[in-house]
């Protein structure tokens, strides 16, 4: 590993610890790893470096794509920024040019790689799992199956795994890993899972366990774990169980850097407003939680790094926050005040205190006292599910489990300091029974694999709450509703603030009772006009109109609610319910400020289009598929020439366009647009400009041409059923059938002229493919030819992704890919 150690030092400036070398040895030898290491001990680089090393050295026995998943957007943003900064240094780019421009980030606020195409993708767990489950959060329903295949053949890293919901995202992640088997490499990282849960993952999934406890020499070397030079301990802990978190204690104990962590946004906001009045003038006060617009939160994150980050040079600051900073953010303080939370969550918070070398910190832990009358929300609900949600609002430890918080506080009060051994004892004492129950639930629910299969089949975003995260939130848009009842709106263009639905309804009831004017429109929902051409998602060009909503209407969950900005305030403390005349409105998203591209197509023939796709596959995909293509024989159970099958899929994906009734309106349009009549030309696309050609397209009945995907799917099935097997035939059939939409289930009547058949024969001959072609057939359903085995689903998702992306790229950049 000498070469690896040298590479590691070049990138980071440090010689790797022994445990970091062991991680690389295992991953690069084909093993999957669960890594149990405390915060601040270098686990991020431990997981990153094997991929970078394999990439730089062109190792074909390691995945060529890495997907790094985190539970919170804040964490993804922070780690992406840190890694990007390290790899963007001039000396690194000069030494290792293959590591340049590899990265992207895909979260709810950043969406620069919606199809997961970069080599290294930092993502929230919601984005990663929604892709695999075929309801990708940022994409339309028609594109539901385009991203699942990105995880096939990838190196999957799950950071802060303990923060995932055990019944939902955690179980679904484990189920996904079981389904992918050897078609991926995996590194799961955790600081606070119990020993029992770690052993469960090891036994069920065949992982290798690496624990910092097995590397005592590393513990001695890791400066962030050692006490400051003049101290015998790293962190002191004081439990203040008889009082709630308060501004007086915060100011009295403040030295240079103080972090305050509250369980609820309201508590954080109230503390911020109190401290703003009484703090010293030269003390900088910062606040971060979930109720900020994305653009403002990004600014806050940057400021937090400047004051609390590793290389900070600014001093005298107090940060008020919620759990959004409790993991992943590389920040530190000398004083921390925190409300109690379950011990695994608390230890994550404590990881932001005295995090760096030669630091000492004091941590003050507070119980959460009874809710004030203002915080108690009385709402009636009809559904049992809703009643349970409302009952949660009465829990003073919300959003956490009451018994776990109480037990954590009791056990924590037995100690006056924190180190690795104490942390492990606390985790195992407080969480063992609870996590053993969770293990039982995961096994009983078969790792959510049945739900995964259902989701592949229907691609329904409603499955989010049963597979990833059971969050009932409403996205709030602040607008001038008083003067804009009849204005057209575009719901997708605004930055929003996310609020828990039942908290919002509690606010709404109080607002409704204290209206400025009985006729006010306080709450509205965007609805499309009857004349709309709306297709699939919010990003349709057509506008929406507002419909007034009553408080009762809010119980039915809507994605976006427009609210009257006179009843809400938005300040440095974030969104609050407070009548004002500030006229604050939601900002426009940065991406929507850009001019929208006009839809255009350039004419290409059937032959040219397929050649462009095949060249696109060679140029953009083939080199990065070496790992997965090598692993497929073991996964599938027999040797199959999948590369040849991908080429056959491409050649037949538009076979239905050879249909005479498909060609007729296309040729008529092209003839009338250009004045050139070429009756034997076989088209894939015509020249088209959305601004000038809409009327001509209607006259030529372009939209009335029959769907084409099903015809190619049927043809592929007939060719492959005998030559390979029914399993292979179903995989390729469905990839073609669903290459425009997962909802396609049949093919229409078709009749293909002989001169068109000659074109497909030419393609088959050029790529040494064989098959007899069906010229005419009556349409029928293909619903019975669907994947029934997990391996069929996985390979279908892998191939349909390649097909769809090649189709997009070859259509958008025809000149680039059409090479004879």
PLM feature spans:
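Conserved pre-motif I regulatory segment
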Residues: 1-36
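Walker A/P-loop
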Residues: 30-50
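Conserved Walker A/P-loop ATP-binding site and its immediately adjacent core
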Residues: 44-45, 62-87, 193-197, 265
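Inter-Walker segment of RecA-like/P-loop motor cores
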Residues: 87-138
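Post-DEXD/H (motif II) to motif III coupling segment of the RecA-like Helicase ATP-binding lobe
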Residues: 143-218
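Interdomain hinge/linker at the junction between the two RecA-like core domains of SF2 helicases
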Residues: 193-254
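C-terminal helicase lobe and adjacent C-terminal extensions/tails of nucleic-acid helicase motors
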Residues: 270, 277-283, 288-301, 341-580, ...
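Divalent metal-dependent catalytic cores for phosphoryl transfer on phosphate-bearing substrates
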Residues: 397-415, 419, 634-820
């Amino acid at each position: 590993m000498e070469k690896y150690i040298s590479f590691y030092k070049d990138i980071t400036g440090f010689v790797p610890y022994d445990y970091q070398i062991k991680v690389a040895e295992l991953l690069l030898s084909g093993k999957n790893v669960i890594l149990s290491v405390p915060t601040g001990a270098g686990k991020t680089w431990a997981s990153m470096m094997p991929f970078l090393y394999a990439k730089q050295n062109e190792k074909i026995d390691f995945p060529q794509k890495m997907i790094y998943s985190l539970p919170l957007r804040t964490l993804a943003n922070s780690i992406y920024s840190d890694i990007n900064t390290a790899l963007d240094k001039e000396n690194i780019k000069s030494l290792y040019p293959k590591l340049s421009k590899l990265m992207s980030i895909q979260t709810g606020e950043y969406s620069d790689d919606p199809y997961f195409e970069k080599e290294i993708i930092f993502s929230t767990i919601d984005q990663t799992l929604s892709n695999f489950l075929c309801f990708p959060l940022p994409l339309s329903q028609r594109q539901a199956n385009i991203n699942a295949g990105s995880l096939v053949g990838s190196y999957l890293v799950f950071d802060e795994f303990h923060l995932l919901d055990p019944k939902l995202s955690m179980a679904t992640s484990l189920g996904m890993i079981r389904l992918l088997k050897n078609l991926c490499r995996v590194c799961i990282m955790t600081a606070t899972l119990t020993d029992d849960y770690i052993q469960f993952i090891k036994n069920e999934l065949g992982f290798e366990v690496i624990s910092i406890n097995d590397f005592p020499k590393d513990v001695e070397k890791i400066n962030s774990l050692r006490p400051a030079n003049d101290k015998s301990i790293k962190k002191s802990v004081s439990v203040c169980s008889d009082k709630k978190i308060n501004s007086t204690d915060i100011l009295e104990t403040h030295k240079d850097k103080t972090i305050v962590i509250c369980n609820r946004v309201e508590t954080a906001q109230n503390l911020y407003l109190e401290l703003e009045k009484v703090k010293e003038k030269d003390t900088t006060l910062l606040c971060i939680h979930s109720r900020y617009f994305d653009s403002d939160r990004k600014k806050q994150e940057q400021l937090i790094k400047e004051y609390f980050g590793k290389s900070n040079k600014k001093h005298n600051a107090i940060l008020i926050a919620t759990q959004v900073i409790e993991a992943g953010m590389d920040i530190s303080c000398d004083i921390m005040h925190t409300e109690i939370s379950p011990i695994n969550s608390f230890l994550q918070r404590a990881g932001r205190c005295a995090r760096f070398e030669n630091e000492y910190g004091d941590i003050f832990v507070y119980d959460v006292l009874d809710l004030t009358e203002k915080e108690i929300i009385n709402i009636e609900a009809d559904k049992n599910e809703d009643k349970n949600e409302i009952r949660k609002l009465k829990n003073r430890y919300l959003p956490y489990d009451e018994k776990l918080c109480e037990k954590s506080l009791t056990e924590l009060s037995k100690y006056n300091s924190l180190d690795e051994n104490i942390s492990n004892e606390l985790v195992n004492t407080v969480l063992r029974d609870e996590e053993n129950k969770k293990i039982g639930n995961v096994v009983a629910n078969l790792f959510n694999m049945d739900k995964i299969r259902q989701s592949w089949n229907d691609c329904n975003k409603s499955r989010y709450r049963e597979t990833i995260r059971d969050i009932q939130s409403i996205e709030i848009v602040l607008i001038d509703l008083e003067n804009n009842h009849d204005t057209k709106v575009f719901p997708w263009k605004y930055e929003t603030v996310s609020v828990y639905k039942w908290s919002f309804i509690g606010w709404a009831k109080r607002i409704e009772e204290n209206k400025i004017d009985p006729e006010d429109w306080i709450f509205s929902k965007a609805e499309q006009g009857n004349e709309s051409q709306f297709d699939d998602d919010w990003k349709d060009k057509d506008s929406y109109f507002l419909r007034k909503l009553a408080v009762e209407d809010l119980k039915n969950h809507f994605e976006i609610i427009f609210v009257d900005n006179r009843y809400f305030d938005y300040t440095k403390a974030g969104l609050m319910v407070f009548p004002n005349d500030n006229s604050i409105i939601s900002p426009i998203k940065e991406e929507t400020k850009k001019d929208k591209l006009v839809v255009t197509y350039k004419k290409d023939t059937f032959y040219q289009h397929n050649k462009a796709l095949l060249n696109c596959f060679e140029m953009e995909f083939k080199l990065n598929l070496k790992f997965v293509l090598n692993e497929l024989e073991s996964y599938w159970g027999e040797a199959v020439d999948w590369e040849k099958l991908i080429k056959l899929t491409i050649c037949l994906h538009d076979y239905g366009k050879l249909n005479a009734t498909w060609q007729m309106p296309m040729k008529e349009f092209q003839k009338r647009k250009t004045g050139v009549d070429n009756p034997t030309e076989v088209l894939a696309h015509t020249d088209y400009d959305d601004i000038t050609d809409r009327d001509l397209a209607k006259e030529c009945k372009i939209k009335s041409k029959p769907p084409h995907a099903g015809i190619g799917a049927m043809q592929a099935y007939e060719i492959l059923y005998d030559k390979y097997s029914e399993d292979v035939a179903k995989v390729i059939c469905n990839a073609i059938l669903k290459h425009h939409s997962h909802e396609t289930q049949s093919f229409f009547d078709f009749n293909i002229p002989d001169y068109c058949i000659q074109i497909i024969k030419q393609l088959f001959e050029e790529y040494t493919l064989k098959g007899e072609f069906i010229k005419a057939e009556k349409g029928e359903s293909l619903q019975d030819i669907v994947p029934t085995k997990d391996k069929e689903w996985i390979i279908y998702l892998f191939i349909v992704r390649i097909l769809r992306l090649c189709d997009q790229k070859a259509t958008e950049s025809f000149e680039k890919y059409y090479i004879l």
